[in-house]
């Protein structure tokens, strides 16, 4: 649900999973066939996992990090992992790059540049995200929702960002 001022988008688990299914349909209806899904950790892991199951394709993972300060709301320097975790040797062929959103576009641009430079076995690369913000300088190949007001997206699992094991002990009285 988008707030009246357009500054915040609150997403339930059901909405989140429905959006991932719609993303799968966009990729499927394009007719493009790919060999591997490469998700960006952490935001792309949940959509990447679900798409991997729907398309029955191997899932590779590349860690990136740029949100650091104020519970992840302020972007810092972008760190991109040097290696990709994949179940079958080196990532190659046609790759679907998955993240949760194109916010500034900086992460997706930098990752694609890195992949093109460092992973010659990748013959074709397309990107898929759930949300694209208006301020993004990168346009993904596949996106479900365009967000013209650039809201902060409150994903359903965000409560775990500040939860610690001691809080779980209190909650579950174990």
Question: Where do the PLM segments sit?
Answer:
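PRPP-associated nucleotide enzymes
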Residues: 1-174
């Amino acid at each position: 649900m988008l707030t009246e001022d357009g500054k915040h988008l609150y997403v339930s688990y059901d909405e989140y999973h429905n959006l991932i299914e719609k993303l799968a349909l966009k990729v499927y209806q394009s007719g493009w066939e790919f060999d591997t899904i490469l998700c960006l950790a952490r935001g792309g892991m949940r959509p990447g996992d679900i798409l991997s199951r729907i398309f029955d394709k191997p899932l590779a993972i590349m860690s990136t990090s740029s949100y650091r300060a104020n519970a992840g709301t302020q972007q810092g320097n972008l760190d991109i992992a040097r290696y990709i975790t994949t179940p079958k040797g080196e990532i190659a062929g046609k790759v679907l790059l998955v993240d949760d959103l194109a916010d500034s576009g900086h992460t997706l641009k930098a990752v694609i540049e890195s992949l093109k430079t460092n992973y010659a076995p990748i013959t074709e690369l397309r990107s898929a995200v759930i949300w694209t913000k208006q301020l993004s300088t990168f346009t993904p190949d596949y996106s479900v929702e365009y967000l013209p007001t650039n809201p902060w997206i409150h994903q359903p699992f965000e409560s775990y960002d500040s939860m610690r094991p001691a809080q779980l002990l209190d909650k579950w009285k174990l």
